[in-house]
Amino acid sequence: MTEQPKNFGFGEDETMLKDAAQKFFADNCSPDKIHGQVAHDPSIHRPIESIWDKSLWQQVVELGWTAVCIPEAAGGIGMPLVAAVAIAEEAGKSAFPSPLISTYCATFTLMACDTDPANKALADIATGTATTLAITNEKGSWESA
């Protein structure tokens, strides 16, 4: 069995990124702010603004966090998976309501595709397009085959 690294691949760059994310989310996602944002309207039909703050999302984009693992050839930064993990962990600690995790999931799925349309989608993600996945069976249905 291969021994796993004790730091799970976190190098100096990833540690600095994690520290920056921790500070960003502490400064911008206090429990009171998050509660005020999402708890005032429990309806499933509430407007998107009550679910996630688009101006805060734009700051995440400007910090390069949506592009952190996207290859440089597609407009990203090209860091390893642990860079996204560092950001995602801090986002989760603060209960940051956003499409960040779904965007990361889409990013890694698209990276595995390595096609022109996938690379175009990666470039869109790198510039701030919030993204998610829709997975269907071979017939295009959500139901089991």
Where are the regions a protein language model picked out?
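Short alpha-helical scaffold segments that flank and stabilize functional sites
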Residues: L17, F24, G64, A106-A112, ...
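Amphipathic, small/basic residue-rich leader segments at the start of a protein or domain
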Residues: M1-L100
